[in-house]
């Protein structure tokens, strides 16, 4: 399932990110690409060793851990420290699939990539082209969100960033290992949690069905989670 998570960063935070990124040194994006995807990857990114990458990454991690919508949709267990990229005119990243296993930066720990995340740092009117195109069983989905918004989608999906024809597109990207690896089960849990939230608003926390459904939710987490 594809999730749009709005307002992960405020407009002020985005402006601060962009001011720092405008003075940064960018490297060829192929440095983090797998053998197959390197042939279709044409962009730039901040070096993983750049102190600015670490600083901005920490701010993104803080924002997503404090975002209830992200927590509900992703059920995160491990998060790869976010990276940052830019696409200028004529740059693109053709259809590819993300690596299934990634090394967590600065450690010897490996993690499974269940969910891929793009946090947009450019407004849609700043560039033409540059859509994130995600393929699933229902077809192709073109995603271009306001700056500060995030899209979350299964890492099993083929996806691309279409060629930029005007301007520049800045974003943060990272991966999540979920407590629940199966996308269908995560989707069911998400819908159940949203139902509980709606009932709490309508009837209050003490409503018997709220208590019963909350019990079911947590028991399903116990049944399906991997920790």
UniProtKB/Swiss-Prot annotation:
<dbReference type="GO" id="GO:0006879">
    <property type="term" value="P:intracellular iron ion homeostasis"/>
</dbReference>
<feature type="binding site">
    <location>
        <position position="98"/>
    </location>
    <ligand>
        <name>Fe cation</name>
    </ligand>
</feature>
<dbReference type="InterPro" id="IPR044862">
    <property type="entry name" value="Pro_4_hyd_alph_FE2OG_OXY"/>
</dbReference>
<dbReference type="Pfam" id="PF18331">
    <property type="entry name" value="PKHD_C"/>
</dbReference>
<dbReference type="GO" id="GO:0005506">
    <property type="term" value="F:iron ion binding"/>
</dbReference>
<keyword id="KW-0223">Dioxygenase</keyword>
<dbReference type="InterPro" id="IPR006620">
    <property type="entry name" value="Pro_4_hyd_alph"/>
</dbReference>
<dbReference type="InterPro" id="IPR041097">
    <property type="entry name" value="PKHD_C"/>
</dbReference>
<dbReference type="InterPro" id="IPR005123">
    <property type="entry name" value="Oxoglu/Fe-dep_dioxygenase_dom"/>
</dbReference>
<feature type="binding site">
    <location>
        <position position="96"/>
    </location>
    <ligand>
        <name>Fe cation</name>
    </ligand>
</feature>
<feature type="binding site">
    <location>
        <position position="169"/>
    </location>
    <ligand>
        <name>2-oxoglutarate</name>
    </ligand>
</feature>
<dbReference type="GO" id="GO:0016706">
    <property type="term" value="F:2-oxoglutarate-dependent dioxygenase activity"/>
</dbReference>
<keyword id="KW-0479">Metal-binding</keyword>
<keyword id="KW-0560">Oxidoreductase</keyword>
<feature type="binding site">
    <location>
        <position position="159"/>
    </location>
    <ligand>
        <name>Fe cation</name>
    </ligand>
</feature>
<keyword id="KW-0408">Iron</keyword>
<dbReference type="GO" id="GO:0006974">
    <property type="term" value="P:DNA damage response"/>
</dbReference>
<dbReference type="InterPro" id="IPR023550">
    <property type="entry name" value="PKHD_hydroxylase"/>
</dbReference>
<protein>
    <recommendedName>
        <fullName>PKHD-type hydroxylase ACIAD0531</fullName>
        <ecNumber>1.14.11.-</ecNumber>
    </recommendedName>
</protein>
<keyword id="KW-0847">Vitamin C</keyword>
<dbReference type="GO" id="GO:0031418">
    <property type="term" value="F:L-ascorbic acid binding"/>
</dbReference>
<dbReference type="Pfam" id="PF13640">
    <property type="entry name" value="2OG-FeII_Oxy_3"/>
</dbReference>
<feature type="domain" description="Fe2OG dioxygenase">
    <location>
        <begin position="78"/>
        <end position="178"/>
    </location>
</feature>
